[in-house]
Amino acid sequence: MAQRSGKITLYEGKHFTGRKLEVFGDCDNFQDRGFMNRVNSIRVESGAWVCFDHPDFRGQQFILEHGDYPEFFRWNGHNDHMGSCRPVGMHGEHFRIDIFEGCNFTGQCLEFVEDCPFLQSRGWAKSCVNAIKVYGDGAWVLYEEPNYRGRMYVVERGDFRSFSDWEAHSARVQSLRRVLNFF
């Protein structure tokens, strides 16, 4: 069974100031809890979290692991808008992901069990990944740019036949890493 608990505290002000919202599980709309959608700092006390810039777990994703994020640019945010969050489902510490060139698991395939800052350095011929399979226990973050930069997408155990299955705008993936979960 996936471990999906933890604690994250969201603050309206920079450096952990202003009104705050403590979350211990899925929160699909911050406004429903009386908190505006403006988040300028975050403290992750336990677990790994994926936050979204819109309610209902939609929009741009941000992965947040254990630690302090005193300003929104620390989590790759371009502004202070955030609408929902949820803990990342973790099953253990055994990581494996297969990436595929074509949709529906066709074409070139590469397996990863460790972080990879640049897929092309491992023999991946293209800048696109059209399907993935996540095995094992852990979750992964896919990045559109090398060295864990650009738009990010969190994927947990399962089959993703097309980039739209992980809510991506395009098939562009150039780096990937494991999600580390601290309790």
UniProtKB/Swiss-Prot annotation:
Listed InterPro entries: Beta/Gamma-Crystallin, Beta/gamma_crystallin, G_crystallin-like
| SUPFAM superfamilies the UniProt entry points to | gamma-Crystallin-like
Keyword annotations from UniProtKB, A to Z? Eye lens protein, Repeat
Q: What's the name of the protein?
A: Gamma-crystallin N
Tissue expr: Detected in the auditory hindbrain where it is highly expressed in the medial nucleus of the trapezoid body, but also present in other nuclei of the superior olivary complex.
Question: Can you supply a Gene Ontology BP term from the record?
Answer: visual perception
- Family designation: Belongs to the beta/gamma-crystallin family.
Give all residue intervals belonging to the Beta/gamma crystallin 'Greek key' domain.
6-46, 47-89, 95-136, 138-180
Quaternary structure annotation from Swiss-Prot or TrEMBL: Monomer.
Q: What does the record say about domains?
A: Has a two-domain beta-structure, folded into four very similar Greek key motifs.
Q: List the disulfide bonds.
A: none
For this chain, one GO molecular function annotation is: structural constituent of eye lens
Summary of the function given for this chain in its UniProt record: Crystallins are the dominant structural components of the vertebrate eye lens. Also plays an important role for integrity and function of auditory nuclei.
